[in-house]
Amino acid sequence: MRSTILAFLAVWVTFSSLSFSADPPKKNSFEVKNGVNISHWLSQSGTRGERRAAYFTRADVEYIAGLGYDHIRLPIDEEQMFTEDGQKEPEAFALLHNALGWCEEFQLRVVVDLHILRTHHFNAAEKPLFTDAKAQEQFYECWRKISGELSKYSIDKVAYETMNEPVADDPEIWNVIVNRCVAVIRELEPERTILMGSNRWQSYTTVKDLRVPENDPNIIISFHYYEPFLLTHYKASWSHTRDLNVPVHYPGQLIADADMASAGNHARAGRAVFNIDVIESHFKQVIDAAQKYNLKIYCGEYGVINAAPHADKIRWYKDMTTLFERHGIGRANWDYKGGFGILRGTEPQTEMINAILGK
């Protein structure tokens, strides 16, 4: 069955790629350095109506630009943007257009990220996207309609990210689907920047498995980084770290020897040592994997939950910023107002913001 699915999808990718492979797109000037994710607005939220409209406004964009960010990553979900029968949701698209207009006004670039599909959630047990041809076509049709709405925006200001954190049983299943998706977008927008992430949550360990279209200079390879997990997801309610009841440290050994007896199931992971050199070795895996395509890389998500020990969190952010700058990696911290946010309520986390922006 797996071989049949891959063979079928491969035919589609090969066929659809012919339309642009002979005449590769010219390089545009979309460049990003330091961004922030606008989470829980058009993605991962049940809020609608006036409350949704008030969650992210022109004042937020002005504030973000004033801090010194140069872009936002804007997650959108299929269920917010489209009805179950595939019709566009006018209110959601109006909000998206508002955000893009505000970003243009305040000179912020935007990565529009199709975050969650009805047929794919990165933490769901069942993901029909990888086994159902109709689900795949629905995914491509989402992008045709998104492109139809957004193609009027400058290719130097707005980029598309195909999908957030794919989790297929086999990386080649995702490779076939994502390359077909790129081909669909290329039929409509030959020179738009497209971000592609690798299988299994866009991990730094799987970028080597990502297959990227050749001779397309407007592709960016995207990865996410949440290591060490005991720190970044400290006591996260949705994670196995929810019962972590000892401090976690950075840099150095994550859990002190004196606390090991109380660390429970986290003792083994807690013995790991993390520092800037370890993180850089992980980044180099991404850099090396991207070199064969001569493409830039982008860290679309990274961050530490607000519940983590403050001083350790700040040291981690400073090291991340040092490495991003050292290797010329664009990035967007997760997130703006959520559990990892640079705002707590309306209160700016100034020390955290300064560490992220290198101030």
Please state what every model-predicted region is.
Residues 308-359:
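Aromatic-rich peripheral "rim/lid" segments of glycoside hydrolase catalytic domains that contact
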Residues 7-16:
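Bacterial N-terminal signal peptides
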Residues 76-90:
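Glycine-rich, proline-tolerant flexible connector loops at the mouths of alpha/beta enzymes
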Residues 1-7:
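Positively charged n-region of N-terminal signal peptides that target proteins for export
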Residues 20-71, 86, 289, 355:
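N-terminal carbohydrate-binding accessory modules
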Residues 133-273, 280-304, 326-329:
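Active-site region of glycoside hydrolase catalytic domains
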Residues 52-55, 59-71, 87-116, 123-159, ...:
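An active-site-proximal structural segment forming one wall of the substrate-binding cleft
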